[in-house]
UniProtKB/Swiss-Prot annotation:
Keyword Plastid: yes
Protein name as catalogued: Large ribosomal subunit protein uL3c
SUPFAM superfamilies on file: Translation proteins
GO cellular component, one term: chloroplast
Keyword Ribonucleoprotein: yes
Assembly and oligomerization: Part of the 50S ribosomal subunit.
Annotated source species: Bigelowiella natans
Pfam families: Ribosomal_L3
PANTHER family assigned to the protein according to its UniProt record, in alphabetical order: 50S RIBOSOMAL PROTEIN L3 (PTHR11229), LARGE RIBOSOMAL SUBUNIT PROTEIN UL3C (PTHR11229:SF16)
Recorded superkingdom: Eukaryota
Compartments, as annotated in UniProt: Plastid, Chloroplast
Lineage: Eukaryota, Sar, Rhizaria, Cercozoa, Chlorarachniophyceae
Alphabetical keyword list: Chloroplast, Plastid, Ribonucleoprotein, Ribosomal protein, RNA-binding, rRNA-binding, Transit peptide
Length: 302
């Protein structure tokens, strides 16, 4: 009698565990009808501070991203018609920061908000006949006249009578016939949701770092008696070659270098609030000036 009642109790406990596990798994599944997904969609908008202290609210993504997300190995990439040209115009922006928000299915995505401050004005159009190559020069981020050199100020006045701008950057493109000095470029005219972009900028400086953090080298013995826990190993033999090879990975300054992150999908373009949202991280810290270009390599697998 005691043994049978014990078996019944164990059976009830197992049933409760199975029911509880199914409830937990159903709550974790990214279903539109699940309460967790509904709560995620309700709180999916994120507040991001743009340069100057202005706050914007980034809403959740739409299903437009689903059709053009980073392709898998099981299906081919459908190249957009306006992305077939490998050399197209780009823009300059300011990294506002990263945030996490959810799509319509309750799945979280890490995104970076890039603010488009006053600027992105065409200051000069270069052609093969006059300069030997085709390029468009952009000016970005308004500033006071006295903060820029006099020759640069005259250059801006000569080409389109542009206001004083802090940054100038050239973009080599295939066709410059559509651009004129003084023209204001808009993000909606150059990028669409689902486009792949290459983002370039200056990475965060980390100062003087050792070989372990800088190059990921293996540390030394940590046991008692060892005096080289994080020291660099051998850098060369005393007899042959009797010197240190050039380019040997050693301790030194880390970061503060120009980096490019490729093939980031554009998640959102807002010309009214003047910002672009891309999936993933971009070089630099908040306030870093970055350049967005249509990706040069668009293949079957992304």
């Amino acid at each position: 009698m005691f043994q049978s009642s014990r078996l019944v109790a164990l059976g009830l406990c197992a049933a409760l565990v199975l029911v509880g596990g199914s409830i937990i798994l159903s709550g974790l599944s990214p279903n539109l009808s699940s309460p967790m997904a509904a709560a995620a969609r309700a709180s999916s908008s994120a507040l991001v501070a743009l340069p100057g202290g202005r706050m914007i609210e980034v809403p959740h993504m739409t299903k437009d991203y689903r059709d053009v997300k980073v392709c898998s190995r099981q299906r081919k990439w459908e190249i957009r018609e306006h992305m077939r040209d490998p050399i197209k115009m780009g823009l300059m922006g300011t990294k506002a920061g990263m945030t996490t928000y959810y799509d319509d299915e309750g799945i979280a995505h890490p995104v970076t908000v890039i603010a488009l401050e006053a600027g992105n004005v065409v200051t000069q159009v270069k052609t093969k006949e006059t300069d030997g190559y085709d390029a468009v020069q952009l000016a970005y981020k308004e500033t006071r006249d006295r903060t820029i050199p006099w020759p640069e100020r005259q250059h801006l006045r000569k080409h389109g009578n542009v206001k004083a701008m802090k940054h100038l950057k050239e973009f080599k493109i295939a066709d410059v016939s559509e651009f004129t000095p003084g023209q204001q470029l808009k993000a909606e005219e150059l990028f669409e949701v689902g486009d792949l972009v290459d983002v370039s900028g200056t990475s965060s400086g980390k100062g003087f770092q050792g070989s372990i953090r800088r190059w990921g080298m293996k540390r030394g013995p940590m046991s008692h008696g060892s005096k080289s826990h994080r020291q660099h190993g051998s850098i060369g033999c005393s007899a042959t070659p009797s010197r240190v090879y050039k380019g040997l990975k050693m301790a030194g300054r880390m970061g503060n270098e120009r980096k490019t992150v490729k093939k980031l999908p554009v998640m959102m373009v807002n010309d009214e609030e003047k910002y672009i949202v891309v999936r993933g991280s971009v070089p630099g810290k908040k306030g870093t000036i970055v350049e967005l270009r249509p990706t040069k390599i668009v293949g079957k697998h992304c």
